[in-house]
Amino acid sequence: MAEDKPVVESFQLDHTKVKAPYVRYIDTETGLHGDVISNYDLRLVQPNENAIPTGGLHTIEHTIAVLLRERIPGYIDCSPFGCRTGFHLLTWGEHSTEDVARALKESLEFIAYEATWDDVPATTIESCGNYRDHSLFTAKEWCKDILAKGISSDPFERRLV
């Protein structure tokens, strides 16, 4: 008898149908003790059409780790996709895609228009596993481009926040 293979949700998504930038609710899981964890797709650029260079993505990652934590109750983690088109956001509890999209927009606005190198946390050899691979300039330019397109609370229809 063949074993059922695990299903990876993001591999089931038709990446040709989505319209980035967007926030997409992926799933909520309930742990053994009733704890609820939600997973969101924060897609910043259109899949298979573009990818954020690693230095810029790395800097966005470090900076939104602080900015989203301040804006989303129950923030757990925000990790980049290997394809470099966005991030997975994990939170305790559930949040609307509109609320997450607003928090993301505010965070990207800060990076694009206000952030200085002092606002990028953990950029030393002691605090980062690849401290040489950061670019605030690249992060700012990509954030401006993403914001110009607008952040949607829906992956398939443009519902800008």
Curated annotation (Swiss-Prot):
It comes from the Bacteria. Fe cation binds at residues 58, 62, 128. It is an enzyme of class 4 (lyase). Involved in the synthesis of autoinducer 2 (AI-2) which is secreted by bacteria and is used to communicate both the cell density and the metabolic potential of the environment. The regulation of gene expression in response to changes in cell density is called quorum sensing. Catalyzes the transformation of S-ribosylhomocysteine (RHC) to homocysteine (HC) and 4,5-dihydroxy-2,3-pentadione (DPD). It catalyses: S-(5-deoxy-D-ribos-5-yl)-L-homocysteine = (S)-4,5-dihydroxypentane-2,3-dione + L-homocysteine. NCBIfam families: PRK02260.2-3, PRK02260.3-1. Its cofactor is Fe cation. Binds 1 Fe cation per subunit. One of its GO terms (molecular function) is S-ribosylhomocysteine lyase activity. It holds the Pfam family LuxS. Its EC number is 4.4.1.21. Belongs to the LuxS family. This is S-ribosylhomocysteine lyase. It comes from Bifidobacterium adolescentis (strain ATCC 15703 / DSM 20083 / NCTC 11814 / E194a).
